[in-house]
Amino acid sequence: MKKLTKLTSLLLAGIMALAMLTACGGTGNDAATAKFEAKAEQVYMAKLNDAFGKEFKNDDAIKNLAVKHIEAMASKETLSMDELWAEEKLTEKTQNWVMICYDVSQSNGKAYVKSSYEAGKAETITPDETTIKAFLNLAQMKRGQVGNTAKFTALGVGAKTINGKTYVAIGLRVEG
């Protein structure tokens, strides 16, 4: 009986230690992180809606593509122009495009440094005007590739926290 009690105590201590390690692991999936990511998405959506002069909702497909693209590029310190963008072809004339937001002041046209926010340190989330303008210019280029009559029909923003830094990718749907 004594051995069973000791074994039970050891098992409970092990389970508690694992629970503590898991809780303190900082995986970036806790409620505060999710709240910060949602706030970043809202701020960027508002800025994009202002730029387009329309009231788009955050499109789920574009948001998911944005988050997947952030995850795919997370390990890279800098990105090339091709790595900055991701495309998802829905049909021959309908495409979703996303761009990871980057720090214009640290980028040189060949290597783009991803911009990020740290939830504990960021008092406000301010989308960089130059990045938004670059996105709009490149979006016009992408629209031209689809066709002269192509239109932007949806916008989306995805945010993902990786190793304590929250990255944002913005995107649109082009239909021609």
Q: What does each model-found stretch correspond to?
A:
Residues 91-176:
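A well-ordered secondary-structure block
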